[in-house]
Amino acid sequence: MMTAPKPSYSCACFYTDNIFIQEFHVHVRYTGEQQFRRDYERVLSSQGCRTSEQFRNVLETIKKEVERRRKLGEESLHRRREISLHYKPLYPEVYVLQESFLAAEFLTAVKYSKSPQANVEGLLHHLHSITDKRIYRLPVFIPEFCAKLVEELENFERSDLPKGRPNTMNNYGILLNELGFVDALTAPLCEKYIEPLTSLLFPDWGGGCLDSHRAFVVKYALQEDLDLSCHYDNAEVTLNVSLGKEFTDGNLYFSDMKEVPVNERTYAEVEHITGQGILHRGQHVHGALPISSGERWNLILWMRASDVRNKCCPMCDNEPVLVKTLGDGDGFTSVREDREQTVDICTLT
C-alpha cells in the first residue's frame, strides 16, 4: 500500500522577511506599508531611494516578491510536470550519480571519514582550510562531468519550457529538483558522500543528521547577474561547487557568522576552481564579486538538519512558526502535530 507523502513546511518568516531589494542592496522585512515606512524609509534614503516614485517602485517590487513566494510551491509543481512531460535530456547519464564523476581526492576524503578511526584532525589532512573560519575547499567533480552538466543545463535553458528562479537573490539559474536531478544525483551525493564529511566538520550544526536539501545552479554573465550581495543561506551546511565555464574575476568572499557585528567582521576571498567545492556553515555571511568576462556556473547544495532548524529558524532566529506548503518546503518537520505551532499559508496576511 502506498503511503501518503510527508507534508512540507516553511517558516512563516519566509513570507515576510529577508526580501532583497537589488537596486539598493538591502534586505528588508515587510508586514505592511506602515511598518515598512517606519522601519526602512530612512535606511533606503541613505542608499539612494529618495523620491516618491522610487519608494513606490520598491513597494511594488516587495509585493511582487511576496506573491511569488506564496505561489512558489504550486508553480514549482506545475513546472516539474511540464518539464517531465516535454523535456528530452541531452545527456541522460548525468542525472544519475556515478563514482566516475567524482574526484579521486574527494573519494579518499570520504573513505577516511567513514573509517572507524576518523576524526576531524585527520580529515583536515584531506581538505584545504581557508583561514580559521571553518571554510573548506575540496575537489568534488572531475572537469569532464562539470562540462557535460553545464551543456545539459544550457540545453534546458534554450528550451521554451517554464523556468523558476533558483533563490530569492539570483535571477539566473536552474532549480535542479524541477529538472529531475535530485533523486538519483544530488540526494545520494549528500547522503553517501557529503554527510560523512560534515558529520566530522560541523557536528554542532547538524552535520551528522542532514535530512533534506535544496539543489540549484546559479549562472553569472555580463548581461545577466554579475555578482551577489552579502547574505547567509537558508541551510545548516552549504556546498558550492564551481562548474566553469570560462570567466574572469567573480571570487567568493566570506566574512564571519551572521551574529558578528558588521564593524567587527574580517573578510577572506576565495577563488573558483572548476570541479572544486567550498564547504561552509550556512549562517556564514558571504557574497560574490562581479565577473568581468565570460560565464560562471556554480552548483549549490543547501543542506538542512530538521533537528537543528525545528528549534530555531536560521532566517529569523526564532522558534519556527510552521506553514504547510506545496512542494519541498524548507526542511522543517512537524513530528507531533498537536505540539507544534502550525498555520495555513492562506491565513497569512
UniProtKB/Swiss-Prot annotation:
Cofactor(s) needed by this chain: Fe(2+); L-ascorbate
Record note on cofactor: Binds 1 Fe(2+) ion per subunit.
Keyword Oxidoreductase among record annotations: yes
Name under which the protein is recorded: 2-oxoglutarate and iron-dependent oxygenase domain-containing protein 2
Keywords carried by this UniProt record: Dioxygenase, Iron, Metal-binding, Oxidoreductase, Vitamin C
Top EC class, one word: oxidoreductase
Pfam families reported for this sequence: OGFOD2-like
GO molecular function, one term: oxidoreductase activity, acting on paired donors, with incorporation or reduction of molecular oxygen
Family: Belongs to the OGFOD2 family.
Residues where Fe cation binds: 231, 233, 286
Gene name per UniProt: ogfod2
